[in-house]
């Protein structure tokens, strides 16, 4: 529990000293849910409108309100499969119905066509989604309870796979 306290103290520092809006918690499913429940409750006493995003998809992350949103990884992989014609587009409809039943109404889902992991390891949305990239981008904005993620350079149509561990600057855009 000493590690838990130290982590919660560090998070509270960022809230009180730097007024951050919230936290993106990497691989949240690998941390005990009890930590997230206790820490979220503690942090929301300091900042009631705190936003907690889990880089995970497990339903139990929402049971006691630890998180506000989580990544929609299954939807992301379905979009890739639809774009590559490995599955029918109706799979996305079926996903939406199932997702609605799987998560509480308050749970937001981070909808994305790319992020730092996908872009670096599996290619840009141009290479993964091809001609379907624009319609899939629109889809991330209209999916129920969706919270669209615009990843680096997507707002300008930048087609590039970034190096994960090396400096890889974005060219100046005018």
Residue ranges of each PLM-predicted region?
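Short, solvent-exposed helix-loop connector elements
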Residues: 121-128
